[in-house]
């Protein structure tokens, strides 16, 4: 009996050690000026934001989270009140974040991967664009002028992001992140009705599908691209050939009207004669 007890204990210990030895990523760092506040680790899934873990910060502001290594690049965020820091995870890496309670979402420092450095750059670019758009909305410019300025700002932003982040490295997690940034709650890149934007989604979808063909994000992005391509495809113009005996040449538009006696007359019946047509509208 005692031997069986020892055996069971050993098996349980081995199982617990195996669980602790599973590949995992780590997120750690400090948040200054946030004593007694709750810091949340959240998963940015395809279905929405999912809470993973949380900690109440002490005076030191140190925190440590961990999670199972994803099978393909995935996205998480740290949330303090209504401020968030976005980051990606694609291995057993350790992401180190240093931030302050004020400016938590933009003035943070992140170490651990190129992807997260680039994601921060994109966050700052988007924040700058949002600030310019807010100022434009308060400028008092005529609606037409303000709209033209808005289009110029957004197009300049998109050109910069396309060139430096999406087409430059479509296989990177930050390229995927760039596709889904928002302005005033709306996606900056349009995956459904903009032919040029669909090309950006297609570039990233192709790379993801090659690297992670079974990942949910790969399939979701691929389906989005297919729908966008269908929506933006130029309609094909088909030539219609009519039989020669069905074609009649006419130098005038034929009009069929009734006279005062109710008799029908066709304009072509009066060919060669001088005809005055009077159109009168009655209200």
Protein language model annotation of sequence segments:
Residues 1-30, 281:
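Bacterial Sec-dependent N-terminal signal peptides
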Residues 19-169:
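A non-transmembrane, solvent-exposed segment enriched in polar/low-complexity residues
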Residues 198-254, 258, 268-270:
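N-proximal helix/coil linker or "cap" segments that precede and/or mark the start of modular domains
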